[in-house]
Amino acid sequence: MSEQFVAQAADPNAVPAAKQSKTLTWGVGEESIDYVASASHLDIYDPQRVLEGKMFNVSYVASAVNGEAVDAASRPVTFAFNGGPGSASVPINFGGLGPRRVVSEGEQFASARYEVVDNPGTLLRETDLVFLDALGTGWSFVADGYDTKRVYGLEEDARTFCRAIIRWLDEHNRWGSPLYIYGESYGTMRSAVLMRYLGEAGVPLAGVVMLSAYFDWSQNLPGN
């Protein structure tokens, strides 16, 4: 199943309103997965209960695999994010892990008509997926009047992601699921700090995936 998308004039800064969900079916060969795709914001509060910002997320939660209902309580959940810093999670979603992908040969920029197909390599076959956009990227934003110095920075960023993950688990009642975090590029540096904050908050991780790990900035500086 494939679709064609053509760019249309729209407000590039328009923020989606309330949570939006749609039931879809992924199918490749004889395999099929019924799942609910949702887009929403997570309200992130600091320890003083002051709103830091709203973190945009896209989630894919399976309801049936090959026609058989799944037990959400035991199905893993993986929280995934790109790096930058300054990148939303669109590349790792539609370019790698999500149930849908944009067709590309990877050798040139895509034309204005984009073909989107079921992704045969999606991790949805093994785990539910939640893609998180860091505050200030994608449709995530820092709350009006909130000091951005308390949000931007390695430690600050990781704390915000920790609060977002806890918020999502609370809202979806998934504390019994095996939990994973999946970071790419700078996202691996985030993960290295995030796993500590999650541990201190009592969030048990079943595993951490580091894609294109990037821990030492000095290796990429001129003269090194």
Predicted features along the sequence, with ranges:
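N-terminal cap/lid subdomain of alpha/beta-hydrolase-fold enzymes
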Residues: 2-7, 49-150
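Active-site catalytic microenvironments for nucleophilic, acid-base chemistry
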Residues: 63, 167, 171, 197-201
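Helix-loop module immediately N-terminal to the HCX5R catalytic loop
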Residues: 154-172
